[in-house]
């Protein structure tokens, strides 16, 4: 880096000075610059960029600046164009780079469909079609059916019978109701709710006095004898396993000892067993 000719004399003077003197001289020049209202002794011109950070121009630096290596295309090229004229040391942080002012043209392009109010045809025509009306009608009909079913089961567990009926005029007005059972649904307050309670003290009809026939699987077959399970009869004879004698264990072991002694004496063994 080569300094300008205007500052050449100052550089030559500083060569002959000691390090302490150079530091003192630089401090004095800085104090004078701040006292004079921002006058700079060096050749750099300072200004404040749009992100609020200070940036120095390279007027005092002579020589050729090297360009960017490689070929940038696409999004990388757009980023480079947005940073054009900004030093790499003074570029804004990522939080400011992604602000509204940085990518406003690209965001405007992506949000174009939202601003113009483009909606898919299926979603746009859904509420204006007969399918939406029929589906919402079926949904309300289904909730009413479920409510009536829950009410019927509640009464049935407590010994009550529930039956909800509808007028025929209502069925003609809503043809969708013909598919469902009319006794389950009641769409308005004109429905009739019939509740029947069992009364044992009331007079029974002749048809109800007859006893109910027993179910066929509950009837027992007459004359059925218990079956003998098939198998081989097991006769266990304890005498075949062991002979019952009146000899005690001590007598039995004594006999065995005597047998061993007699066998050893007959063979002429050198070992003598002491009983």
From Swiss-Prot:
Top-level taxon of the source organism: Eukaryota
One Pfam family from the record: FYTT
Residue ranges of the motif UAP56-binding motif: 11-29
InterPro entries for the chain: FYTTD1
Keywords: mRNA transport, Nucleus, RNA-binding, Transport
GO biological process, alphabetically ordered: mRNA export from nucleus
Predominant cellular place of this UniProt entry's protein: nucleus
Protein location: Nucleus, Nucleoplasm; Nucleus speckle
Bilayer-spanning residue ranges: none
GO CC annotations on file: nuclear speck; nucleoplasm
Keyword S-adenosyl-L-methionine: no
GO MF terms, alphabetically ordered: mRNA binding
Family under the similarity heading: Belongs to the UIF family.
PANTHER family in UniProt: 40-2-3 PROTEIN-RELATED, UAP56-INTERACTING FACTOR
Role of this protein: Required for mRNA export from the nucleus to the cytoplasm. Acts as an adapter that uses the ddx39b/uap56-nfx1 pathway to ensure efficient mRNA export and delivering to the nuclear pore.
Protein's name according to its UniProt entry: UAP56-interacting factor
Organism (species): Aquarana catesbeiana (American bullfrog)
Primary gene name: fyttd1
